[in-house]
Curated annotation (Swiss-Prot):
Keyword Lipid metabolism: no
Protein name: N-chimaerin
Entry annotated with the keyword Metal-binding: yes
Classification via Gene3D superfamilies: 3.30.60.20, Rho GTPase activation protein
Organism in which the protein naturally occurs: Bos taurus (Bovine)
Length: 334
């Protein structure tokens, strides 16, 4: 007759095997959710969206904790150097090939973000390892997004983090949130505070009681980006997704468009869409649904690379739809 300890051990082993099989099935579901399709004679039935939703709901608490822990880490974003032709005073050597930089004027190029000095020919071979120095990055607004997060060693621009925290702390029930404009002079004050003080800028209720000033400062930050949050390179793919009529194919195309964004842009967009999704949960109080937020943020986050004014004007409705889709499907797409 088996002992009590032996019986307990068998029970534990069976439980372990059962748990392993269950986790294996959940992992299979997650793998399948990455875009599998079922073919038919005349059309294909896309199961990507509902399957991913189901797989997401099956995530174990262990996987959730691991995901959260991973998200807390500051990623190592790649950044190309911002080289400008430069005239050096006194003798200088190339920091790439170590050879002397000859000439009296325009002897080479210098990175405006990290200060790297190289020959013009060598600049084409320098890897994308720019590490911006704060003494070269003097502003927060109108600064390239990836440059800013690398210079300050943050996951997202501090403007985005701080403004969203303040808005969610005291403004989610404010009627017309993001639609109502704040006083422009005070919004400019917030901008100057961030440029001057960085993360030490005071945007609390004691300084700015009207939450529309904070929302205005956040929108201004995105408008002032030299490269929009949804970049010029990715813009056509996002617009293409908005023109697709089939919902599942539309989401797949949108998912592909997100892959075209630089990592820092994609992370900031993910964080913003999660926030806007929470804004829509208070729609009864603030009267702002995904469609209304799309109208506000479409032209703010996206700018057409085309110089043709009429073409850019025609894209406005698709820009609105892109943001609306990102908000509604935030938990699936990111």
């Amino acid at each position: 007759m088996p002992s009590k300890e032996s019986w307990s051990g068998r029970k534990t082993n069976r439980a372990t095997v059962h748990k392993s099989k269950q986790e294996g099935r959940q992992q299979d579901l997650l793998i399948a959710a990455l875009g599998m399709k079922l073919g038919s004679q005349k059309s294909s039935v896309t199961i990507w969206q509902p399957l991913k939703l189901f797989a997401y709901s099956q995530l174990t608490s262990l996987v959730r904790r691991a995901t959260l822990k991973e998200n807390e880490q500051i990623p190592k974003y790649e950044k190309v150097h911002n080289f400008k032709v430069h005239t050096f005073r006194g003798p200088h050597w190339c920091e790439y090939c170590a050879n002397f930089m000859w000439g009296l004027i325009a002897q080479g190029v210098k990175c405006a973000d990290c200060g790297l000095n190289v020959h013009k020919q060598c600049s084409k071979m320098v890897p994308n390892d720019c590490k911006p120095d704060l003494k070269h990055v003097k502003k927060v607004y109108s600064c390239d997004l990836t440059t800013l997060v690398k210079a300050r060693t943050t996951k997202r621009p501090m403007v985005v983090d701080m403004c969203i925290r303040e808005i969610e702390a005291r403004g989610l029930n404010s009627e017309g949130l993001y639609r109502v404009s704040g006083f422009s002079d005070l919004i400019e004050d917030v901008k100057m505070a961030f440029d001057r003080d960085g993360e030490k800028a005071d945007i609390s209720v004691n300084m700015y009681e009207d939450i529309n000033i904070i929302t205005g400062a956040l929108k201004l930050y995105f408008r002032d980006l030299p490269i929009p949050l949804i970049t010029y390179d990715a813009y056509p793919k996002f617009i293409e997704s908005a023109k697709i009529m089939d919902p599942d194919e539309q989401l797949e195309t949108l998912h592909e468009a997100l892959k075209l964004l630089p990592p820092a842009h994609c992370e900031t967009l993910r964080y913003l869409m999660a926030h806007l999704k929470r804004v829509t949960l208070h729609e009864k109080e603030n009267l702002m649904n995904a469609e209304n937020l799309g109208i506000v943020f479409g032209p703010t986050l996206m700018r057409s690379p085309e110089l043709d004014a009429m073409a850019a004007l025609n894209d406005i409705r698709y820009q609105r739809l892109v943001v609306e889709l990102l908000i509604k499907n935030e938990d699936i797409l990111f």
